[in-house]
From Swiss-Prot:
Residues 30-268 form the AB hydrolase-1 domain. It comes from the Bacteria. Coiled coil: none annotated. Pfam families: Abhydrolase_1 (PF00561). The keyword Lipid biosynthesis does not apply. This is AB hydrolase superfamily protein YclE. The gene is yclE. It comes from Bacillus subtilis (strain 168). InterPro entries: AB_hydrolase_1, AB_hydrolase_fold, AB_hydrolase_sf. GO terms for molecular function: hydrolase activity.
């Protein structure tokens, strides 16, 4: 099997990158962005398969309305899994990709051994986003709030200059909400990442707003790991997930106390220890 390449799926060139050996972990999102988040140590312990979905892939044809449907994305993931001859995978979704990961496990349960969901809220509704914003304003330090206000002021001009990368610009300008500690070079994580904005807009803006992960967890029987950052103000507060405690015995919830939206990058040792323990169970 090639360690990197392209899988052609329904008019999209989906990139993949494979690192390490062992039990397969299928990481949904960008094959450029996500390998940068995880430590070299944990990437040696398992077979990490980083794959694009069509929101991060250049289309080979004109976009159609159905290209933004979640079931089309799930079909891409299944096509990639078949193409790479992967079996019995742990499927991993971070942030909005957690919705994709759990939906894939619900749709293709025979192909999934475990599910890992990181740094997401149970839904992406406007009401939940307002709660997250209120939590930030009520609990964040004055220094953090000032830094966010300063950074976000530059977002409109970033988008004016490069509207097709507005998703990336929003992620970069929200750094004060994303990281426990300031990371001056965090923008480099997004270097070379293509964004297919019509698809991202539909999924993040509409589809994920209608999905309640707390309810969908009842539909899967395989083990689920939910990893959260205490200072992840993008999807705060972590108490949004309190309902899983005692309700779902197949779900393990872990809160990383000195992390924001990327605990695998911010607390690599604690992350690796916790995640490896769960993977090896």
């Amino acid at each position: 099997m090639e360690r990197a390449g392209i899988c052609h799926s329904d008019g999209f060139d989906l990139a993949y990158r494979i690192e390490g050996e062992g039990a397969p972990i299928l990481v949904i999102g960008s094959a450029v962005y996500y390998p940068r988040l995880f430590s070299s140590d944990i990437k040696q312990k398992y077979q990490w398969v980083f794959v694009d979905h069509r929101g991060f892939a250049k289309p080979k044809r004109e976009l159609r309305a159905e290209d933004s449907r979640l079931d089309a994305v799930l079909a891409d993931i299944e096509r990639m899994r078949t193409f790479l001859q992967l079996e019995d995978v742990t499927i991993l979704g971070h942030s909005g990709h957690a919705f994709m990961a759990l939906e894939y496990a619900r749709t293709y349960p025979k192909q999934v051994r475990k599910v890992a969901l990181f740094n997401t809220a149970p839904d992406n509704s406007e009401e939940r986003q307002r709660k997250s914003e209120s939590f930030f304003m009520e609990t964040a330090s004055l220094e953090r709030k000032k830094r966010f206000e300063k950074d976000i002021e530059n977002l409109p001009q970033d988008i004016d200059k490069d509207p097709e990368r507005r998703f990336v610009h929003m992620c970069i300008r929200a750094e004060a909400k994303s990281f426990y500690q300031e990371r001056p070079h965090a923008a480099a994580l997004w270097d070379g990442v293509f964004t297919n904005m019509p698809i991202i807009d539909e999924l993040w803006g509409n589809t994920f707003a209608r999905i309640d992960l707390l309810q969908r967890l009842a539909d899967v029987r395989m083990p689920v790991y939910i990893g959260l950052g205490r200072y992840d103000y993008l999807v705060a507060p972590v108490s949004l997930w309190d309902a899983v405690d005692g309700l779902y015995p197949h779900v393990d919830k872990v809160i990383f106390e000195k992390s924001g939206h990327q605990p695998m990058l911010e607390e690599p040792e604690a992350f690796d220890q916790s995640f490896r323990k769960w993977l090896d169970q």
